[in-house]
Each structure stands twice: as C-alpha cells, then as structure tokens.
Design a protein with these regions (language model features):
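Active-site micro-motifs of SAM-dependent methyltransferase domains
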Residues: 19, 43, 87-90
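A short, surface-exposed loop/turn module that caps and links secondary-structure elements
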Residues: 38-63
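Surface-exposed, Lys/Arg-rich phosphate-binding patches that contact polyanionic backbones
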Residues: 16-28
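Enriched for short, Lys/Arg-rich terminal
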Residues: 1-12, 31, 67, 72-97
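Short, well-structured alpha-helical segments
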Residues: 30, 34-38
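Residue-level recognition of oxygen-bearing side chains
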Residues: 16, 57, 90
Length: 97
C-alpha cells in the first residue's frame, strides 16, 4: 500500500516578512526560518503552528527559537502568506495592514 505525498502549499512572503529576513533577524535565525518555511510550513501549516488571538486573530503562528512567524493560510489556493517574523516579545506590538 502506497500513500500519496502531501501536496505542498505555496509560500509567499509579504513585505514585512521579507524585510525581517533581510534586515532584522540574525543570520542564523533567518536561515532557520527559510528552512522551516520551505519544509514543514509548506507541507503541514496547520500542524506546525497554532491559531493566534487578539490583534492577530485569523492568523497562525509558529515559533523558531524565540522568534514567531505569523502567517495566514489560504486553503482554496493552497497558499501560505508569511506576514511577519519577529521576536515573540515584539511581534504583537506592531500595527498590521
């Protein structure tokens, strides 16, 4: 009996997430985030994160060390929109678009 591999989600980085990777995150954290997004997040976004509440309601979040990756899942088009990445103590204090 063979099982079909899970269909991957497309990962799209929004401007704030791209800026975080290029400018704010330490190099090792940025590399870990990119690897996580390309592997686990693209395959099982519901399992690797959790739903967020408050100002981030409707989004999911996953931790890489002390950094939170905030993302939204579009099931219809199988796209994960990575909205922002920052230290978990800072991510909740920035305004969202």
């Amino acid at each position: 009996m063979t099982t079909e591999p899970a269909q991957r989600y497309e990962i799209r980085f929004q401007p704030a997430a791209r800026r975080a990777i290029a400018q704010r995150l330490p190099e090792a954290v940025a590399a870990a985030v990119l690897e996580f997004c390309d592997a686990a997040l693209a395959v099982k976004p519901h399992q690797v994160g959790k739903p967020l509440f408050g100002p981030l309601a409707g989004c999911n979040g996953a931790l890489r060390g002390t950094y939170r990756i905030v993302y939204r899942i579009d099931e219809k088009s199988r796209v994960v929109h990575v909205l922002d990445i920052d230290h978990r103590s800072e991510i909740y204090h920035r305004p969202r678009q």
